[in-house]
Amino acid sequence: MFADVSADGLAGKIVIDTANYYPERDGHFTELDSDDRTSSEVLAEQLPGARIVKAFNAIQWTSLRDKVGEYVGGQRIGIPISGDDPQAKRVVAGLIGQIGFEAVDAGPLAEGGRKHQPGTDCYTADLPADELRAKVA
C-alpha cells in the first residue's frame, strides 16, 4: 500500500500517519478489506524502527483551518491518536495541543486505529474532547 515510502533515515523517528484507506482510491488490499490489520499497522511494518502515531486522519483540513482553539461546551475539539509508543504519542499530543486542539488517546495502532478510521462515529465529527474520549474508550 505504501510502496513509495522509504524507511531510510526514519528509524527512531516519529512518523505521524495521517492516511486513511479508501479502496476505491487506493485499490483493494485483502488484509485491509478483511480488517485483519489497519493501514497504520501496514505502514509500521514497512517502516521498521519508526515510531508511528496515527493522528489528523479523522479531522478535515477545513476544521484544522477554521476551528483552531475553538471550544465546544467548554472543551477543545478532540483529535484521536493511536500508537504503540507512549512517548511518541505524548510528543504528538503536545503538537496537537500547541495548534489549539486536544489529543484523545484511542489506544494502540491495531485497536485504536480502527476507532477513528472512515465509517466510525469519530471520523470527521469534530467532537468535544470528552465526548470523543467516551467514543474511543
Regions from the PLM with identified roles:
Residues 5, 27, 59, 104, ...:
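Residue-level signal for pocket-adjacent positions within structured domains
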Residues 74-137:
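Active-site-lining helix/loop region of Rossmann-like oxidoreductase modules
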